[in-house]
Amino acid sequence: MRFFRRTRLLFSATFITGLLLLAGALLVGFDIDEEGRVRPASNGVLAQGIENSTDECVVCHVDQTPGIVNQFGESDHFSNNVSCSDCHLVEEGYAGSVQHPNEEFYVLPLSSTAQCAECHREQVAQFNLSRHALPSYVAYAGTDPLTEDQLAMYQSIPERGGIDSRNRNSLHAMEGEAVTRFACETCHNVGRPNPDGSIGNCTACHIRHEFSLEQVRKPETCNACHIGPDHPQWEIYSESGHGISYLTGGDDWNWDAEPGNVTTVDFPAPTCATCHMSGFGLSATTHDVGDRLTWYLASAISSRRPAWEENRVRMQQVCLACHSNNFVDDFYDAGDALVDSINTWVMLSDWMMQPLKDNGLLTAQAFDEPIDFTYFNIWHHWGRTAKFGSWMQGADYVQWHGAYEILHDLAILREEVDAKLEEAGLEPLDLPDNFPSIDAARDVVGSQSE
Ligand code: HEC
Ligand code: HEC
Ligand code: HEC
Ligand code: HEC
Ligand code: HEC
Ligand code: HEC
Ligand code: HEC
Ligand code: HEC
């Protein structure tokens, strides 16, 4: 009895508190949905001008989604009379659209590149030609899910190739959808096809709904994806002279400078965007991030790109705004020589694995025995890291996360290969005494220069 009385008391107390909360919420203007979740109806700090807007979407969404309206109010879109409708309102039946809650019209809940293309045709065309578009998606999904048109578009990208996929896609299959939607896909969906057939997601870099130049020019934007053991561009940049200039003095830079011809007055040192995208010096703004690259650095064994000579000129024109001709030429010669050394070590690792392949001593399944990881890490982590580190000035990544790790894993690879050969009654690898030095690697596989 006592128990029931207590629970009844508890129940009434909860009920009354609930009622009070509800009344309170209604009084101060909170919004409660069918599931009992409460949302603040207005947070009061509206961007200048937006409170006078007569746009029906804005008028209602100020209460429904105040965060979005606030960000939109800060944007150049709002001050240039671009409206919510321009990006979201579509015909009934438009692929990916839904009927707007309580209204007759249809909206795209996630606006697509097709809407941006109405006004920013050039940026979209450049983006579509880059590895941020379909190649990013194909890197984990393969080409099977592409429509005929998308396949043709993918095949028309001159720089889509160059990087052999060496088992990487098998990680996607091994880990399964529940994991990869938070992993591979979070980064690689920058180039995923949308329901309406357009490609990619501009908001992978341009955070909605402000679409601010300052935000997208800052290197933190790129570090959403260009980070970690296999592509540590953010870490490398942070320890370079350029990154240190940004981290210690960037507050004073002219982040909102008009795009097209940004100068050294605006940016005394470069960010990722300056070197790879901004109109700077004689190089025009581009959304094709491959447009200034010489090498396929992400490759196991790097080769030069189809249009590498023109690309290199475009990158060097950026450097030349701040550095001398000789400085830039010396730097490029040194970078090319480093690529040659890393290529040589990776070829040595291929040479070491060859007898296992020839004698059927490896399992068919990728990543099921330690040797698969050792072999993979040599090029996918350490080789890449050393190359990126040299080209973007991160000494620690060239040395301790790069060359040193290569030597370490080559020594382990030798033990792992020899163990398998001996188990099969075969001779161990015949390697020179100074293995795994670069001289030994050159002796075994020859020089790779030019
Ligand atoms: C009378 C109020 C009202 C008007 C007018 C209005 N909206 Fe909405 N809108 C809402 C509400 C309420 C939601 C649902 C919010 C939620 O689910 O949390 C919503 C949701 C949305 C969504 C998300 C839909 C989804 O399924 O995720 C979009 C996009 C949107 N509105 C765009 C617009 C555009 C564009 C206009 C003008 C053409 C507009 N809205 C006009 C109240 C309004
Ligand atoms: C310049 C184009 C553009 C304008 C203008 C714009 N949006 Fe969006 N909006 C987008 C994009 C792009 C996305 C989806 C981003 C993604 O895929 O991650 C989005 C997402 C949304 C979402 C769903 C995501 C969420 O966070 O709930 C809502 C709701 C929305 N917008 C409402 C609005 C409203 C209301 C306005 C006007 C006040 C507006 N948008 C103006 C481009 C725009
Ligand atoms: C209806 C036309 C229209 C649509 C649709 C549109 N924009 Fe814009 N956008 C503009 C205009 C106009 C400006 C201002 C141009 C200027 O300042 O020179 C602008 C400016 C920008 C800027 C530069 C902001 C700045 O501070 O200068 C970015 C970034 C941008 N848009 C991205 C997008 C993206 C991404 C989409 C799609 C999600 C999109 N826009 C959709 C018309 C549009
Ligand atoms: C943190 C973001 C991130 C995650 C997670 C991620 N990648 Fe990547 N991936 C990148 C970036 C950035 C590059 C580009 C490296 C470069 O060019 O320096 C890349 C490059 C690649 C490449 C080489 C490019 C090509 O077109 O062949 C493949 C293949 C690839 N990733 C597959 C995957 C798979 C499969 C997964 C999941 C098992 C995955 N990635 C997870 C960001 C990511
Ligand atoms: C890899 C990140 C990234 C992606 C993805 C991206 N942008 Fe940009 N965008 C930038 C950067 C960085 C700038 C600033 C360039 C500069 O410094 O002038 C910029 C500038 C812009 C501008 C204003 C500059 C100008 O030349 O007028 C527009 C408009 C724009 N982007 C539209 C888009 C559209 C549309 C998409 C999707 C197809 C897109 N962006 C995808 C990084 C990106
Ligand atoms: C949402 C994730 C994401 C963001 C954010 C992002 N990238 Fe990427 N980026 C990728 C992926 C994935 C690849 C590899 C694509 C491939 O090769 O298949 C890539 C490749 C590249 C490449 C090599 C292109 C080539 O042709 O090999 C450059 C350069 C690059 N990104 C620069 C940038 C810069 C600069 C920024 C910031 C302004 C940026 N990225 C932001 C995911 C991202
Ligand atoms: C000083 C200019 C500069 C800055 C700053 C810079 N990069 Fe680079 N980046 C380069 C050069 C040069 C290369 C090598 C180009 C080549 O192949 O010739 C490169 C290579 C790359 C690659 C490798 C592409 C491939 O072939 O696999 C990626 C990805 C990349 N940078 C992204 C970034 C990101 C992200 C940032 C900021 C965190 C950044 N870069 C900062 C100049 C720069
Ligand atoms: C906007 C100006 C600017 C641009 C563009 C620029 N740099 Fe720099 N660079 C600097 C500054 C500033 C430093 C830091 C100098 C110091 O450490 O005293 C620096 C340092 C360097 C260093 C280290 C030099 C040393 O003595 O330690 C290298 C290497 C370098 N830059 C290469 C490049 C390359 C390659 C490019 C083009 C891909 C480039 N930079 C583009 C301004 C620039």
Task: Please provide the spans of the model-predicted regions.
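Short sequence/structural segments immediately N-terminal
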Residues: 2-450
